[in-house]
Regions:
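Conserved ATP-binding subdomain of kinase catalytic cores across diverse folds
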Residues: 1-74, 100, 104
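Regulatory N- and C-terminal appendages and interdomain linkers associated
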Residues: 86, 94, 101-104, 125, ...
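Conserved protein kinase catalytic/activation segment
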Residues: 116-128
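AlphaC helix of the protein kinase catalytic domain
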Residues: 72-84
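Flexible beta-alpha connector loops of hexameric P-loop NTPases
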Residues: 29, 83-89, 137, 141
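Activation of the activation-loop gatekeeper triad in protein kinase-fold domains
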Residues: 67, 128-133
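Activation segment/activation loop of eukaryotic-type protein kinase catalytic domains
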Residues: 132-142, 147
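Catalytic-loop of the protein kinase fold
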Residues: 104-114, 119
Length: 226
């Protein structure tokens, strides 16, 4: 499973039981996921990401602050709300910034969609983080981030079709890989892919030409010294 890559279980008995899928193993797996969610919530809350603030984790039960709407009731999920184009654009922009902030904290949600984002009185709040992965330690992190961003685009694009032409995911990941991504990095929503296939013959010819030029340069230098 993509989410579990690079997650370590120190107890060898638990690890074997989880691998076999026994009752004890399933319980251990559930506890591990709860622990992973707690760790992710604390980490992201410290980074300023819009997630519910964890209050306590007692006997395997995670208590979090209530995410409320303007009336003080439990905030709805995005999939239960209809937006104007302006609202969709604004909420999409907010969530793209949160995805960036998460990535800068080293975390990829891994299952981000309209079903696990609440609309609080002051804006969207991201929930459901047991499957969050370490951006640097999981080989599937890039694919997960691209999927998260695509889910946001597809959902809000229903209300603001202009979003369907954006390409924030690859842009964000490229900046992250180059080590220049920060929560303040301006994004364009555009990304130029190199769709042209690489011609290995041309590449090898360029290498040979460079090698010949270097050999000629060395020969000239030797002739000058003589």
């Amino acid at each position: 499973m993509d989410y579990t890559e690079n997650r370590k279980v120190k107890n060898s008995r638990q690890a074997r039981a989880m691998a076999k899928g026994t009752k004890f193993g399933r319980e251990a797996q559930e506890a591990a996921w709860q622990s992973a969610e707690v760790d992710a919530l604390y980490r992201l809350a410290a980074a300023g990401v819009r997630v519910p603030r964890p209050q306590q984790f007692i006997d395997g039960v995670l208590l979090m602050e209530l995410v409320a709407d303007a009336e003080g009731d439990a905030a709805p999920r995005l999939n239960d709300v209809v937006f104007t184009p302006e609202q969709a654009l604004a909420h999409h922009a907010t969530l793209i910034k949160e995805v960036v902030r998460m990535l800068c904290a080293g975390v990829v949600h891994g299952d981000l969609s309209e079903f696990n984002i609440l609309l609080a009185a002051d804006g969207p709040v991201i929930i459901d983080l047991p499957q969050a992965v370490d951006a640097a330690g999981n080989n599937h992190a890039q694919r997960m981030l691209l999927r998260d961003v695509t889910n946001l685009k597809d959902f809000f694009g229903q209300f603001a079709p202009a979003l369907l032409g954006t390409d924030f995911g690859p842009e964000i990941w490229a900046l992250y890989e180059r080590g220049v991504l920060s929560p303040e990095t301006p994004l364009t929503g555009r990304f130029q892919r190199l769709d042209k296939p690489v011609n290995l013959g041309d590449v090898m010819r360029e290498i040979d030409d460079a090698r010949d030029e270097e050999a000629a340069r060395r020969l000239r230098m030797q002739s000058g010294e003589a």
